[in-house]
Each structure stands twice: as C-alpha cells, then as structure tokens.
Amino acid sequence: MNAQHSSADLRDVIRNAKRIVVKIGSSSLTGENFEVSPGRIDRIVEALEDRMHRGSDVIVVSSGAVAAGMAPLGLTSRPKDLATKQAAASVGQVHLANAWGNSFARYNRTIGQVLLTASDAGQRDRARNAQRTIDRLRLLHAVPIINENDTVATSEMHFGDNDRLAAIVSHLVSADALVLLSDVDGLYDKNPADPSARFVSEVRDGNDLKGVIAGDGGAVGTGGMASKVSAARLASRSGVPVLLTSADYVAEALGDAEVGTVFYPKDDRLSAWKFWALYAADTGGALRIDAGAVAAVTAGGNSLLAVGITEVIGDFHAGEIVEILGPEGEIIGRGEVAYDSAVLITMLGKQTAQLPEGLQRPVVHADYLSDYASRA
C-alpha cells in the first residue's frame, strides 16, 4: 500500500482479509502458576470462531508449550538449559493441544497440530511439505495450530520466537493479514507513563520506529516487543499487512481491526521463493562482491556475474543458497548459486567472455536473487 492509503484503508484490508494468521503469546494462554488457562483460550477461540463464521480462513500460531509444561513438572521458574526446556515443551505441548482442541470442539471444529523447526523452513522441500499439510488441513475444515517444535529444536537451529515463525508462516500460506497478539496494546513514541506519550497507530517504514517503545514501557530494543516489531517488519516487507495489539482486544482485532498498531506492507509482494531464500533458507556459504556489483544487483536488479565477485567464503555446491556480502562484509542479500565453490574460485573477477563456454551463465541469476535493500 502506498502513501495515498490511510490507516483506515489498511485496517479495512485486515478486517476483510480472507486468509489470516493469528499468533498468540504464552502470557495470553497461561494463568497463574504457568498452567494453561482454558478460560483465556475459550475467549480467544470465541473471537477466532466469529472470524471464521464471517468467511475467513484462520491459521493459529500458538506459543506456550514450555510455560504449559512447567506446572505439571513441578518447575517454579522458566528453565534456562535446553534439555529442561525441551522436556517442559514435550509435556506442555500435550496440555496446550488438548486445551485448543477442547475449546474448538464447542463449535464442532477439529484442530490439527503442526510442529515446525527452523530447519523445516530452511529446506525448500520440507517447507513445501509444511505448506501442503497446512493447506490440506484447511481444505478438510480443520484449524491448523502451529508451534515451534521446541522438543527437537537446538539452540543453534531455532526460530528464536514464535513471532518470527508467524511471519514466515504468513508468507508460506499466502496470508492476507497477520495479527500478533500478546500482553501489550501497541507502540508509543515515548514511555506511556509520560502524559505526552503518543500512541503509534501505524508504521509505514523504519522511520516511524525511531524512539518507539512498547506499550508496557519496555524498549523496542529489548525483550518481547523487539521480536514482535521485527516479525511485523519481516511480514510487512514481504507484502503482508500486520496488526499488533493485546490479546485482551482479540475480539476487536479480529472484528473491526480498530485497535493496536498496523504495519503497512510493501506494494510488491515477494514471491514464495524469494521470501524463503531471503528470510528462511539455510545458507551454505557466502560471496563477497565489489561496489559495482552491489549497485548492479540492487538498484539495477541484474544477475550477479563472476567479474564482480572478489571472494568465495565456505564450501558449497551449485543450487545452494549463499549470502551475498558487500565490500565491507555487509549483507546485501541471498541467492541460489549456479556453481560449486571450488569452481567459482577459478572464475573470480573474470569477464564472461574470458570464461569457458560452460561457465558463462550468471553466478546468481536475477530470478534467484533477493536483496534486502529493496525490502527496506
């Protein structure tokens, strides 16, 4: 949506979105003593059911597995070590799924649990399988309940938070909108305790986030709000409009969408492949390129040729996704490389005409190259 569109226009888009992803944070699903709260879940499901009754497809991204497993295991504080977190998640996931299932059963609806890891999203074939599973659940009139598979995810290979997972899922399923629900009502331009604090109702680009802090007084650069803003920007950069608000306003968020902060999407929605390559794919290595090549692949939208590559980093094979770095090591984007790293080393800095006939294809074709600058 461009500058001519108002916040009311964007809220109307979210209000009428046919396919919507709704992410709910742990604190909105659990009560005191870290137990799953059926009452809180029932209230959320009531709003979800009302939205589905209006004709929308709803995909739920649910946090809360680790928190829900703490009380049954006798844990009084959130575990810090990976093994205990995974044990809590394995117990909590059962309680959480039962709570969702029982609540939706009041409306004669079935749920389907989908547990994902970062490696699932990072491998293209596994990402497609996840997409097909979610699509089939919807066709069979089951509500997909998605969560990170904390039981098997490692500290090195995980989404980090379900906000990012929700952003990735929203693009994976071609959602028309993403709603992020937590325990904060939106963004402010200064501490809300300050009488002059202004509620930030819309974010069009990064400039609108300067000095912004969370509705609960926490800085955007710290804690949970940082991940929510990051996820909202991730989804909006890919072309998905986002509404960020408190779970206390779930009925309003899924009703008239007149609450919270909205994030404007880019007009040009990224293709599924480019989004996956840029934000989800595993990378096999990196290519450092010169300033001329940076301009060619960003402003020019051209393919990356061997002449502009100054360094090959890591060992990789043709067809893998690699990071593309600028002269100072800054990340420019990602792309699917056409040659093995061992072959590329022999091609560095050479004009296409200087290369053997079998090596004259672009190193990264423009169709398989995503740059971050175009999504700012």
From Swiss-Prot:
The keyword Nucleotide-binding applies. InterPro entries: AceGlu_kinase-like_sf, Asp/Glu/Uridylate_kinase, G5K_ProB, Glu/AcGlu_kinase, Glu_5kinase, Glu_5kinase/COase_Synthase, Glutamate_5-kinase_CS, PUA. Keywords: Amino-acid biosynthesis, ATP-binding, Cytoplasm, Kinase, Nucleotide-binding, Proline biosynthesis, Transferase. PROSITE patterns: GLUTAMATE_5_KINASE (PS00902), PUA (PS50890). GO terms for biological process: L-proline biosynthetic process. Residues 284-358 form the PUA domain. It catalyses: L-glutamate + ATP = L-glutamyl 5-phosphate + ADP. The keyword Cytoplasm applies. ATP binds at residues 23, 182-183, 222-228. Substrate binds at residues 63, 150, 162. It is found in: Cytoplasm. Pathway: Amino-acid biosynthesis; L-proline biosynthesis; L-glutamate 5-semialdehyde from L-glutamate: step 1/2. Pfam families: AA_kinase, PUA. SMART domains: PUA (SM00359). CDD domains: AAK_G5K_ProB (cd04242), PUA_G5K (cd21157). Gene3D superfamilies: Acetylglutamate kinase-like, PUA domain. Coiled coil: none annotated. GO terms for cellular component: cytosol. GO terms for molecular function: ATP binding; glutamate 5-kinase activity; RNA binding. Its EC number is 2.7.2.11. PANTHER family: GLUTAMATE 5-KINASE, ISOPENTENYL PHOSPHATE KINASE. Catalyzes the transfer of a phosphate group to glutamate to form L-glutamate 5-phosphate. Belongs to the glutamate 5-kinase family. This is Glutamate 5-kinase. The gene is proB.
